[in-house]
Amino acid sequence: MAEEFKKRQEELQKLVLEFELQVKNNIDFYYDSEYYERIVKWYIDNHKFKLGLRAIEIALSQHKFSSDLLIQKANILIALQKFSKALISLDKAHSLNPKDENIFILTGQVKIILGHYDDAI
């Protein structure tokens, strides 16, 4: 099991490095939204939020209607303390996927941080 985890981590690291190389060299590329989600999660897990935000912008340029990518964008914006922008991203995600409870939870958390307690409920 530990070996399988290590292998997955190495594959993810390789994917992130490939992505960074393509961005650095301004190479046109396309990834499935799930690959972008994995790349962005790696940046979030490693506290590289600005790089994660860059990755999410590229991902959303290719997958405009992915509520999961918009939620990840909101998570990064929250980590960067850009709460108003996070709410905009969450609002877009909600319009695409109105039943996703993660959107409600994150929206409530951001509204509490902003002191909008009545709106957080």
Q: For each of these PLM feature ranges, what is it?
A:
Residues 59, 92-93:
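Canonical positions in the second alpha-helix
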Residues 14-20, 30-41, 68:
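Amphipathic alpha-helical repeat scaffolds of TPR domains
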Residues 14-17, 47-53, 80-92, 114-121:
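Structural signature of tandem alpha-helical TPR/SEL1-like repeats
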